[in-house]
Amino acid sequence: MDIRGTDTPLLDWSGEAIALGIFENETALTGELTQLDEKIGGTIAELIEEAEFEGKSGSSVATRIGGKSPIRKLILVGLGKKEELTLETVRLGAATVARLGKKEKVKTLAIQFPVVDNDAAQTTAAIAEGMILSLHQDNRFKSEPEDKPLKLETVDILGVGEQSEAINQAETVCSGVILARELVAAPANTVTPVTFAETAQNLAKDYGLDLEILEKDECEKRKMGAFLGVAKASDLPPKFIHLTYKPSGTPKRKLAIVGKSLTFDSGGLNLKVSGSGIETMKMDMGGGAATLGAAKAIAQLKPDVEVHFVCAATENMISGKAMHPGDILTASNGKTIEVNNTDAEGRLTLADALVFAEQLEVDAIVDLATLTGACIVALGDNISGLWSTDETLAEEIKTASEAAGEKFWIMPMEEKYFEGLKSPIADMKNTGPRAGGSITAALFLKQFIKETPWAHLDIAGPVWADKENGVNNAGATGFPVRTLVHWVLK
């Protein structure tokens, strides 16, 4: 699909289908829409009247254009109230257009939406993202793909100018999102710690990233007892992955992104039982997948920021070598942990990863993890929890998420709740009381950061969509690659 920006007037464009964004309660035709309506035989006014189209957010309607018009299809998309227009409105509207264009089997399409905040570049990028991500289908594991090959070949975004840089950036970011989606969607017999590390190797080779992979013996030398405690039950070797993007000049900032990378989580000896969603636990490396997705995008966009990508990849399995409930592990910072639940393993792998990241002497660390069901209970499937020791960092991420159209909610770091993690025989337990479980998980991770500004993103809900939702089709979403990229770029 070739996406292009253009100043070609609406009345001069020729192709198969035109998509128009309409504000709520502003369906009366004026200006060039009146002229276009006359050109195509009154189809716009007729469609608005017959469909009782009001322009409400999320609404859409399409029809065939009769007569001798070279334009065969018309698509109207509701953008909601004019004063509430955002980049996300445009992004979601573009996703609707893309799906309707595919359904209507058009090859060439023009889309005309209003420019948000007089920023044609950002508006163009949002439209491109909405179209690319909504049309992505992962058919790798089907013998006969359900969908026929995509018909949509060319999309012209009208009224924005050429905008090749904005479109290229959107395509690059989407390539990172799609990598994350495909890693999360792939089963655990395809994406293992070994193949996950191979993905990192391919990124390093293709995009000029520095790569260090610590094998088990090196992790032992570094005393990563928390990470290795989780890893020891698996027949597959753990892989501690460290990718680095370095700009050509002096970096204005150094950042670290740390992703939880459990390629499968059985729960360990605290085995996940029937009804617990064990079959979905291939997605427990969603944080690591997004970390590699962000690495792919950032390496191509080349910001003047040094970024370290850290993934402690392993499985949480059962065997005679498995860690027991009640075991005490020692992390690489010397902190001891009583394992009172082997199914709270992600935080154990992150503990050593955070210690490693801080030793890189970066200016800020962000970790992301499908960490707790408690966060889903609190915020649902569409919103990620955000905890931080630094107010400025939290606001940076929140701002980046709003630009990306990915939702975060800043959560409390209630220090008193750490009382629930105290152990009589170790420095802490790995889980606390049921109440406030996502907060105690964040407090646990905080014990492995000394002074560096740090934020924790619990992405357990948004990493997967059970049904079509916005720019996401059912399946892995690639959340929050776009937020991470926006954060680094800004």
Swiss-Prot record:
Residues given in the record as Mn(2+) 2 binding sites: K260, D265, D284, E345
InterPro entries named among the record's database cross-references: Leucine_aapep/pepB, Macro_dom-like, Peptidase_M17_C, Peptidase_M17_leu_NH2_pept, Peptidase_M17_N
Keywords: Aminopeptidase, Cytoplasm, Hydrolase, Manganese, Metal-binding, Protease
One Pfam family hit: Peptidase_M17_N
Key word Protease present: yes
E.C. number(s) listed in UniProt: 3.4.11.1, 3.4.11.10
GO process terms (BP): proteolysis
Top-level lineage group: Bacteria
CDD domains (UniProt xref): Peptidase_M17
Protein localization: Cytoplasm
Main enzyme class: hydrolase
Gene Ontology cellular-component terms listed: cytoplasm
Entry note: cofactor: Binds 2 manganese ions per subunit.
Active-site positions on this chain: K272, R347
Reactions it catalyzes: Release of an N-terminal amino acid, Xaa-|-Yaa-, in which Xaa is preferably Leu, but may be other amino acids including Pro although not Arg or Lys, and Yaa may be Pro. Amino acid amides and methyl esters are also readily hydrolyzed, but rates on arylamides are exceedingly low; Release of an N-terminal amino acid, preferentially leucine, but not glutamic or aspartic acids
CC cofactor: Mn(2+)
Record-linked Gene3D superfamilies: Leucine Aminopeptidase, subunit E, domain 1 (3.40.220.10), Zn peptidases (3.40.630.10)
Residues annotated to bind Mn(2+) 1: D265, D343, E345
GO-annotated molecular function: manganese ion binding; metalloaminopeptidase activity
Role description: Presumably involved in the processing and regular turnover of intracellular proteins. Catalyzes the removal of unsubstituted N-terminal amino acids from various peptides.
Family to which this protein belongs: Belongs to the peptidase M17 family.
Name of this protein: Probable cytosol aminopeptidase
